[in-house]
Amino acid sequence: MPNFASTPAPVHTLWDTPDMATQRLPGVWWVTTPSHGGFVLSDERQAAMPEALRLDSIYYEEDVNWSLVVIGFEAEFAKLKDQNFDIERDLAHQTARHWRPCQYGAFTGEVITPSDSYVLKKVEILEASIGEIGVRSASGDWADWVPKGKVGVTGQRIAGCDHLGFVRYEGPDFTGLCDAARYDSTRPVNTFAALGVELLPSP
């Protein structure tokens, strides 16, 4: 296992000025800032990240991309004998499998399916919805144009999505109303057809 140099704590980050920085491994800093946080790697560490897991930037944010660093240097982290590392390691694998399935599969050799990954499941649903009108915004009956018990929706046709499940829309805007009980903002996508939207005339 190569020896890596310790580095000074980051003074500036992509997110903000750090208010806390801990060197978890030589050249691997965990920082928090007033706005966000995550891992910051030295240039040496960034070059040593497995190619399948390496990002273009040295910043691996705390919501998802941190998991790539833990997996990439898993053996070194394990050698520290941190009593909580087993939990962190399991969470890292779960996070990467769900949210970075292509990178995780490329690194581990596992075949990741939609049942294993939230992102792949979302992509599957979106690809099945291409051509339909997808909801882009919704308003409750607090809005002056939405009757009581309804949800007002606006949307465009779904043209596709990328590998992370970010939707690409195209064409004109559509506006309509659906029953409030049918609208669920937690779905990966809401289509006008699935909601039974009653289209409103264009302004």
Model-derived segments and their meaning:
Residues 63-115, 164-202:
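Short, compact, well-ordered microdomains
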Residues 1-33:
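Eukaryotic non-globular interaction segments with acidic/serine-rich, low-complexity composition
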Residues 37-39, 58, 149-152:
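Short beta-strand micro-motifs in enzyme catalytic cores
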Residues 29-54, 161-163:
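A short, structured beta-strand/loop element
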Residues 15-18, 23-26, 47-56, 64-70, ...:
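Catalytic phosphate/metal-binding cores of nucleic-acid and nucleotide-processing enzymes, i.e., regions
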Residues 42, 60-63:
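Short His-Asn-centered micro-motif
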Residues 121-203:
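Eukaryotic intrinsically disordered, low-complexity regions
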Residues 5, 56-59, 89, 93-94:
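Alpha-helical interaction segments
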